[in-house]
């Protein structure tokens, strides 16, 4: 694993240290900023190929976690260094991930070539969480060359993965109906590859045909594949297809992830300033002054963003 050391002496030599670094980023503060900046400095000077980041999205129950686990096992068998970041819904009280490390990956103690971590969304809205964007940079700087980011589920918030990932894999189940929701959310338009998981169940072939028919009218429609994370059928072909797409989309990945981190950081800071203004009463005071005609709305917005 590559070594990344911040000004406080923390190094990403092991997966344990990487986990601690991500925890530091979740807490925020100067130590987190130093870690991220050092990772960015190293990535900017790295001459080798950057990591391939694959966003995995789809409706709950489609088997995203199990499929990601199967893809990771296959990639690891080919000596790829694989990291999985599972974006979980946040607890309102604690801000932590509710589901924990839900990804189905066989534990291999001592294997420094795989890393699994749950990341809290922290109410990020349409964007991925600030932590998820930062964590993707840290795992890349730590030497992982294949990164899966699994989102919560098909919906408007999952469109944030498009900003961050090199490729977007949309996972659908065989039951039908979920593809309509994916179309409404714009995920089918954003996906680079679509897979119907659970091909061992009835209805999988029909789901593939429905998706292909729905995508046929679009420009540059993504390929639709069949796979089963349970019996392993189609997993190797799916990984090969993803790797092939990664080659065609090589270049610009690091800049994309830095832009995603920057956007998420700005959103997080603005949200924190709004929470602060609400808790100390400034938000109510500004609303009162606007209602009284003493202050324009745009001026109040600027004042909140400045934190004054």
Positions of predicted regions on the chain:
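Conserved P-loop NTPase nucleotide-binding/switch module
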Residues: 139, 151-191, 196, 201-210, ...
């Amino acid at each position: 694993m590559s070594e990344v050391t911040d000004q406080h002496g923390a190094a990403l030599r092991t997966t344990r240290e990487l986990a601690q670094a991500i925890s530091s980023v979740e807490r925020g503060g100067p130590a987190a900023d130093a870690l991220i900046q050092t990772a960015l400095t190293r990535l900017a000077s790295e001459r080798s190929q950057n990591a391939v980041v694959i966003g995995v999205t789809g409706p709950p129950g489609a088997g995203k976690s199990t499929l990601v686990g199967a893809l990771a096992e296959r990639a690891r068998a080919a000596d790829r260094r694989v990291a999985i970041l599972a974006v979980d819904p946040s607890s309102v009280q604690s801000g932590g991930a509710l589901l924990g490390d839900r990804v189905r990956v066989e534990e291999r103690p001592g294997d420094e070539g795989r890393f699994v971590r749950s990341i809290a969304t922290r109410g990020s809205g349409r964007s991925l969480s600030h932590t998820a964007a930062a964590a993707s940079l840290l795992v890349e700087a730590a030497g992982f060359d294949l990164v899966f980011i699994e989102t919560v589920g098909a919906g408007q918030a999952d469109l944030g993965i498009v900003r961050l990932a090199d490729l977007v894999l949309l996972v659908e189940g065989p039951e039908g109906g979920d593809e309509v929701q994916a179309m409404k959310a714009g995920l089918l338009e954003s996906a680079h590859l679509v897979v119907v998981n659970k091909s061992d169940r009835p209805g999988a072939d029909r789901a593939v045909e429905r998706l292909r028919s729905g995508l046929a009218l679009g420009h540059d429609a993504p390929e639709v594949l069949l796979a089963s994370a349970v019996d392993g059928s189609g997993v190797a072909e799916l990984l090969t297809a993803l790797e092939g797409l990664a080659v065609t989309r090589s270049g610009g990945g690091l800049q994309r992830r830095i832009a995603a981190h920057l956007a998420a950081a700005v959103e997080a800071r603005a949200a924190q300033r709004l929470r602060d203004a609400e808790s100390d009463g400034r938000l109510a005071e500004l609303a009162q002054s606007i209602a009284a005609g003493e202050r324009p709305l745009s001026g109040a917005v600027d004042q909140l963003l400045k934190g004054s």
